Amino acid sequence: MKINSPLEAYKYLPQTNCGECGEATCMAFASKLIDRSGKPTQCPPLVKEKKFAKKLAELERLLAPEIREITIGVGDRAVKIGGDDVLYRHKLTFFNKTKMFYDVTDTMDEAALLERTKKVADFRKFYVGRNLLLDGVAIRSVSNDPEKFAAAVKKVSEVGIPMILCSFNPAVLKAGLEVAKDKNPLIYAANKDNWKEVGELALEYNVPVVVSAFNDLDGLKTLAKTFAEAGIKDIVLDPGTYPSGQGLKDSFTNFLKIRRAGIMGDTEIAYPIMALPITAWMAGISDPVSAAYWETAMAAIFTIRYGDIMILHSLEPYATLPEVHLAETIYTDPRTPVAVDSKMYKVGEPDENSPVLFTTNFALTYYTVESDLSSNGITCWLLAVDTDGIGVEAAAAGGQLTADKVKDAFEKSGFDLKKDVTHNTVIIPGLAARLQGDLEDKLGARVLVGPMDSGRLPGWFEKNWPPK
């Protein structure tokens, strides 16, 4: 993105405040463009009126991310990689979190192939209000047989998740593309020996392609430039991922050099980067648990330092869970705390005799409390108070959680402690105990101080509920 101020974007808008984009003013729409929650094409006058054609083209150029954004796959499960504008998250945010693809081979029998593919497709981990997923499958041609590879690709494509077709043999890649040409797979990879044939395949089938040059940045840049000049736009860079020692250090340094150059304006290398933690299994580690451990460590290294897409092997929970959790954490937008809606929630099927509690609307706090309650079979009413997405202790200390805020939250939720429950009692977090007296005055209700940690709620309820 070449501009970072709404005022700069505003110059390219119609400046009529017509409201057709859904915003009250053109300046409000300009703000959406800068924070990337809106697109120039969402302004109807820019698109429809010929006099704005040049402004639209220039605005799209200025707003385009420094690192090219690429889509892999089709439909609801399609994934985007790249699209970043900064080297450090605190300067804006990182976009399009690292995508995790897990390998299968064309020598696996059909049952094992489908079982592993479906394991990737069906993976779900609920975390802070959302499901974390694995992103796709990388089909490796071990046989080097076009027919076998095509058969494997066909079976995997039926599951409906994004694919990477992996072979250095253009004939094998072509066979795979023939059966998956409408699935927009990523093809891996073009190198100094096969670049011409693989480039032709990328153009013929209009699919994204990986260019690969292990520990040779000049060669990698030359390949990327050659492909771009040939009209191939969707390019992914593979600078090589060595699993240990000096090679791993060099790989890490190469990732830094590539991303820094791309962000600083070198358009010839401003593409997403592929990491290959799967090489941990080629490092001579005989114990599969140790190999998976090292693969996960490598995945962590390159998630933190600009790996946009990865190919991995282990599907054990001790490997996949750290991988997806770290990616989710690194790519959380620091500009906006993760928050739930401020309202009254039901835990189980509460009635007029059920206890009433509140916590803040910081998502991690809310879901921790909700989980501790539901997992212990505690049926209750749980109010999320709007604290701008800040946790209980910090919000109570900083003034975002006050008796007035809690009273307002009850009123906005439409919940009346005197009418909707028989006990006229509310339980507050132990970390907000200072609010007890003020809340009793504001709410006209009995206020009980709960434990400091929601994990202690079951024991607290045994001793203190129902109130005497």
Curated annotation (Swiss-Prot):
This enzyme's EC code(s): 2.1.1.245
Textual note on the cofactor: Binds 1 [4Fe-4S] cluster.
First-tier enzyme category under EC: transferase
PROSITE patterns named in the record: 4FE4S
Catalysis performed (reactions): 5,6,7,8-tetrahydrosarcinapterin + methyl-Co(III)-[corrinoid Fe-S protein] = 5-methyltetrahydrosarcinapterin + Co(I)-[corrinoid Fe-S protein] + H(+)
Protein's organism: Methanosarcina thermophila
The keyword Transport is annotated on this UniProt entry: no
GO biological process: acetyl-CoA catabolic process; methanogenesis, from acetate; methylation
Presence of the UniProt keyword Glycoprotein in the record: no
Gene: cdhE2
Domain 4Fe-4S: 1-60
Lineage, top ranks: Archaea, Methanobacteriati, Methanobacteriota, Stenosarchaea group, Methanomicrobia
Designated name of the protein: Acetyl-CoA decarbonylase/synthase complex subunit gamma 2
Residues at which [4Fe-4S] cluster binds: 18, 21, 26, 43
Entry keywords, A to Z: 4Fe-4S, Cobalt, Iron, Iron-sulfur, Metal-binding, Methanogenesis, Methyltransferase, Transferase
SUBUNIT field: Heterodimer of delta and gamma chains. The ACDS complex is made up of alpha, epsilon, beta, gamma and delta chains with a probable stoichiometry of (alpha(2)epsilon(2))(4)-beta(8)-(gamma(1)delta(1))(8).
Cofactor: corrinoid; [4Fe-4S] cluster
Function, as annotated: Part of a complex that catalyzes the reversible cleavage of acetyl-CoA, allowing growth on acetate as sole source of carbon and energy.
UniProt pathway: One-carbon metabolism; methanogenesis from acetate
GO MF annotation terms: 4 iron, 4 sulfur cluster binding; anaerobic carbon-monoxide dehydrogenase activity; iron ion binding; methyltransferase activity
